[in-house]
Amino acid sequence: MKAVWYESNGPADKVLVYGDMADPVPAAGEVLVRLHASGVNPSDVKARAGSRPMGFPRVIPHSDGAGIVEAVGAGVDPSLVGSRVFVRNGQWRRAFGTAADYIALDAGCVHPLPDGIGFDTGAALGIPALTAACAVLRDGPVAGETILVHGAGGTVARLAVQIAADCGAGVIATTGRPERADDVMAAGAEAVIDYRSGNLVEAVADAAAGRPVTRVIDSECGLNLASSIEILAEKGVIVGYGSVLEPAPELPFLTMMFKNLTLSSILVYLLGDEEAAAYAAIVSDMLERGALDARIQKVLPLEDAARAHELVEAGDRAGAVILSTA
């Protein structure tokens, strides 16, 4: 099979290799997927650059992908053969991810991709869409609640806006990119606030118009912790799926305790198969109804993996970067 791999950390154009490798064979409990698309996420490019040590002598990057099940290992339902699926956790604690023609992985890490939904879209779902669904729905239904979603110009947060709105919540969103405000409104937000201007707490209160804000979803949890605590109503929840700019914030425990607040973190790779399947079903249902837009910014051929990594590293994307493996 054709694949992209690296054997040391470093710049994409220096360490990524495009070439031939042996086709994988599904072990017991696994499926073999003929991949048509591979999604490039920030965690993939950070791992390649050296954010953590090499876990294996050779790594095929990327955890997200989409394709067709070609074979199954022992103990797996043979009726899965021929199914269109999207893939998660392709390179989580495993050497060989989705930047290849084939991947063999645990059957619990593939989810049905609805007919009519392209493989490129499927490859954009695993990490971003399941993170967003978990952030919105981990604690149960949100219909009638008012939710604050930070950084809604970003991929995960924009998906969270769509999921929360579709589930019946009122959504207030923030962005540091005012030019994307109309797009965030179109995704389902009732109000969009430029978090760089004015008093954020007051702006959220004005947008909420007396409604209690019960949930804050944030990719920079530590940076915004103080304002999130102030914004939230009693028994509210802060859901953090990142905290790069302030990784070790001071935690005002007593303030949180006297509001009975919950601080919840998400690492999508650690979702159990049943929980992930439940979120995947919600995402698939929204896709079928045309209620979810998993935006694609760029599709490149597999051999251009280095360019794809560079695009993700550059930041300021308005959608996913995908490698075509068809």
Predicted regions and their residues:
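C-terminal hydrophobic helical "lid"/dimerization subdomain
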Residues: 1, 274-326
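Short glycine-centered segments of the SAM/dcSAM-binding site in methyltransferase folds
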Residues: 84, 146, 170, 236-237, ...
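Short, glycine/polar-rich helix-capping loops at beta-to-alpha or helix-loop-helix junctions
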Residues: 98-99, 175-183, 248-253
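Mid-domain Rossmann-like dinucleotide-binding core that forms the NAD(H)/NADP(H) cofactor-binding site
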Residues: 123-197
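Glycine-rich beta-strand-centered segment in the early N-terminal region that forms part
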Residues: 22-40, 49-91
